[in-house]
Amino acid sequence: MTPVVSIIMGSTSDLPVMEKAAKLLDEMEIPFEMHALSAHRTPAEVEAFAKGAKGRGIKVIIAAAGMAAHLCGVIASMTTVPVIGVPINSTLDGMDALLAIVQMPPGIPVATVGINGALNAGILAVQMLAVGDEQLQDKLAAYKEDLKKKIVKANKELAKVSFKYKMN
């Protein structure tokens, strides 16, 4: 099986966040790879990865970084493969990473999710892959239906909570 999604993180300290995307891709039966690459510490490896991704069959790249979060943009600057950026909460409550990822110059887009939003990055990657793939669209629909059922159940449980002035 050849991976179609790459999950890239600045270091393995990002794994607790990024494993949410990995678990979703596993659940959706999408082959993926994971690498630790740093725009600042391993720039040659980042360049080789980015320039070779399309040729290796990668369709979507999920890249995560904290602090001076240049990894996502550097990768996006060297490939035509869509890049989804995940800002990692570190210094400044992740705002530095968020702004570094979202404020890309014209022509070098990085789709950006919320701080530590690896699950949404995984979902977005699946949605990109599902264009023209009815089986994957069905899996996404089932996933979202399951989310709906969880909220309906939670709402029913909330109805049982009692307070003196709660009217429902």
Predicted regions: what they are:
Residues 2-41:
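Glycine-rich phosphate/diphosphate-binding loop of Rossmann-like nucleotide-binding domains
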Residues 3, 30-31, 80-81, 102-110:
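Glycine/charged-rich beta-loop-alpha catalytic/anionic-binding loops adjacent to active sites
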Residues 14-18, 42-46, 65-74, 93-95, ...:
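Short glycine/serine/threonine-rich phosphate/pyrophosphate-binding segments
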Residues 34-56:
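N-terminal beta-loop-helix "entrance" segment that forms/cooperates
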Residues 49-87:
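Glycine-rich phosphate-binding loop
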Residues 92-138:
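Short, glycine-/small-residue-rich phosphate/pyrophosphate-handling segment
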Residues 129-168:
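Glycine-rich phosphate/pyrophosphate-binding loop and the adjoining helix
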